Amino acid sequence: MAASRALSLTAEAVRAVIPRRSGRLLAVFPRLLTRWETTSSIPEAGEGQIRLTDSCVQRLLEITEGSEFLRLQVEGGGCSGFQYKFSLDTVINPDDRVFEQGGARVVVDSDSLAFVKGAQVDFSQELIRSSFQVLNNPQAQQGCSCGSSFSVKV
């Protein structure tokens, strides 16, 4: 039964492309549209936190200068439907949430926060690559082996 449900979700074309308040586009599966519209309100204090690992804090302190911070965004795409995007930024928008730990800051817009609340941001350094990653995301059903894309829980 689960396999047939997964197949029907995969077979459905992405029907809705919703303009985000920030001007970016996010593709959403039709059944998720209602769920995210009803549950993506601004989180209350203590709800929807993003945790930073020690290695994330350390790396951010090494690479950021002045008012720079790490921006985490969720976009439609990747092999699992959604993907994480990391960038350094200096502008905090009205709909952004700022998560600070040990002097390092990660900023997430309210639309993306619905997809990553409760997750952990880490910095991983390996022989073949070094990157920021989202770990232990309670909103993600599964991810791909690259670690940059995921599908959301329905």
From Swiss-Prot:
Transit peptide start-stop: 1-8
Single GO molecular function: metal ion binding
Any single Pfam family the record assigns to this protein: Fe-S_biosyn
GO BP, one annotated term: iron-sulfur cluster assembly
Entry binding sites for Fe cation: C79, C144, C146
Keyword vocabulary terms for this entry: Iron, Iron-sulfur, Metal-binding, Mitochondrion, Transit peptide
Subunit structure: Heterotetramer; forms a dimer of dimers with IBA57. Interacts with [2Fe-2S]-ISCA2 forming the heterodimer [2Fe- 2S]-ISCA2-IBA57 complex; [2Fe-2S] cluster binding is absolutely required to promote the complex formation.
Gene that specifies this protein: Isca2
Name by which UniProt lists this protein: Iron-sulfur cluster assembly 2 homolog, mitochondrial
Gene3D superfamilies (alphabetical): HesB-like domain
A GO cellular-component term linked to this record: mitochondrion
Role of this protein: Involved in the maturation of mitochondrial 4Fe-4S proteins functioning late in the iron-sulfur cluster assembly pathway. May be involved in the binding of an intermediate of Fe/S cluster assembly.
